[in-house]
């Protein structure tokens, strides 16, 4: 039977009663009973009498209960103290009479019935004797509730048992399905378009809050990382550990959308939607694309480009201009020169290749460098290794990028992109050199030389090639960073490329100035110099010729101890540095090869020079790390790159103190990776004139710049008073306020420990204490045994 014949038959057969129904117009009976005037007094009085009786009964009942409780209280009072002490023991919540009480299953009613009502009464009386009053009260309450429930329960059980399970609805048979299909096939289907909601820009506080919540969720995830069946890598690197669990497809899709939307918003809008902001943790675990696979995530770079206030590269949509310059040797990373120079985002899961504007995964390091500025585009990561170093998981690439400088080529040295990734993960060196400005972890290890990406063979990054040279600092052959500091230097020069397209590095030439053994592509002065030359030109900086002064580039301070003010972050302090977001480069240990050579180090720039990452203590107190990408990156940066995995993560933000110069162990910092501070957000300042290089007097100058007429009537007690106060504080606590004077509030907040941390600390010390006690006991036993042996041997000697 087909559809039409069914319809015909239905039309032919009228319903069972063919008689048409009509409405009757007759008025029906009234719905409510008519009200009778007057009151039926007898009924009302009877009702009132009944009520009074009930009230009296209740009062009597209450009185009896109260008397019973008072009597019990008297009984209990005499040994209350003993009982209180006993009730604090762990064994049981009742009083403790020396015999551990077995917790009885809570079937008071059932067991009572079996043993006879009298016995059950006695047992409850005994229990009650040992209970404190509050317990008694709660206990009696819950017992009465339980009794009521149990009385009600049996009938319910019987009722439930009868019907059994409902039979499942009969399945549609095939013909019905066909009919249904025929009916539905021509009906239009509503396609619900997801509404795209423009997210408003968020304030720093909101961002911090969001990040905090996200981290919280991540912690929960960490407990069961095997979600959706995928193994997820946890990136040790950044303070916020992102678990990326998303399927790679969704990642691709999302990144496409992001890139579309962000590229449209030019100059300006620097949209900080959280999604952009984090460039979503990408699914790291399962997608390690091998080197050459192509991966569309354009997002981070595109986003950058749109996203920051800076104007995206001249073309407007960060295009990777350089596609072609793909470093020949390097893993296929292709630097994207997209204007967005820095993606400082956090390393996104491996899959996301930050710079990805180039569109291919950066050698696995992808993630770690996710932050590499997109400009740098390719994390040089362990280049060879093919898997993201470390951070892979970390996932959120927050693009910080000041998007590219006007020239459209990446400005920040790879922009802050410091790949914060820390995990030693695949690469031998295991850890990306972290910030190494170039943003790409220079995990030397795998590739040995992590060859500079940029200029493919030539060793000098090609102009746009942007950070083009991820070159790992290690002498290429050596496979390990040269100079202890090695890793630090991974800083790519490329970025430094000035507007003109040639590296502005002080050295001027595209190639790093004298890296010791390395090929020219390597940054100079073994990392020590932290690529001194690679001074990325700050976005804003205009003159092509000179490295942007303010730019965050790390130029090693002449002294050689890198003074690290990370420029990027101290957003507060001087967010004015244009480049600030630019790159902070951790300097790796004090530069080993002497100070960087060549013009590059500019003494004046000291503060802005490299940031030391050491154990999270940044050398320059000034960098207020908090804000942007400037965060020091993985310790690996500190020259440790060779070390396998950092042992501990320093709390969220590195705390810098001016007078602390990390001690170098044969040139390496003994660094621990410092994690990214949770709340940080790249500091954005509108593109503007480049600031003069920040010199040691920068503090004074900034104070002048920040003069605010409204603050004229602000009453300040004056420095004198503060010093007095800090003197007293020092006397009491041995605390030196001056030491933290330049610290951002943000950093200081992380110096305080939370209650939870204290608890952890206590638990840890307790554990250690127990271990020590056990060891002592063992030692004592051994000593006793030895003494016994000696006695025996002495006796034997005597007997002979």
Curated annotation (Swiss-Prot):
Skewed-composition ranges (Low complexity): 155-164, 328-360, 367-377, 390-424, 443-501, 514-581
Coiled coil: 53-82, 196-224, 756-800
Biased composition (Basic and acidic residues): 197-226, 249-259, 273-295
Cited InterPro entries: Chromatin_SPT2 (IPR013256), SPT2_N (IPR054552)
Region span, Important for interaction with DNA: 1-687
Location within or outside the cell: Nucleus, Nucleolus
Bias-annotated ranges (Polar residues): 260-272, 608-626
Keyword list, A-Z: Coiled coil, DNA-binding, Nucleus, Transcription, Transcription regulation
GO BP: any one term: regulation of DNA-templated transcription
Pfam families: SPT2, SPT2_N
Skewed-composition ranges (Acidic residues): 124-137
GO cellular component terms given for this protein: nucleolus
Pro residues bias spans: 684-693
Region (Important for interaction with histones): 688-800
Example GO molecular function: histone chaperone activity
Domain remark text: The acidic C-terminal domain mediates interaction with histone H3/H4 complexes.
Family: Belongs to the SPT2 family.
Assembly mode: Interacts with histones. Interacts with a heterotetrameric complex formed by histone H3 and H4, especially when the histone tetramer is not bound to DNA.
Main function: Histone chaperone that stabilizes pre-existing histone tetramers and regulates replication-independent histone exchange on chromatin. Required for normal chromatin refolding in the coding region of transcribed genes, and for the suppression of spurious transcription. Binds DNA and histones and promotes nucleosome assembly (in vitro). Facilitates formation of tetrameric histone complexes containing histone H3 and H4. Modulates RNA polymerase 1-mediated transcription. Binds DNA, with a preference for branched DNA species, such as Y-form DNA and Holliday junction DNA.
Entry protein name: Protein SPT2 homolog
Highest classification ranks of the organism: Eukaryota, Metazoa, Chordata, Craniata, Vertebrata
Gene name as annotated: spty2d1
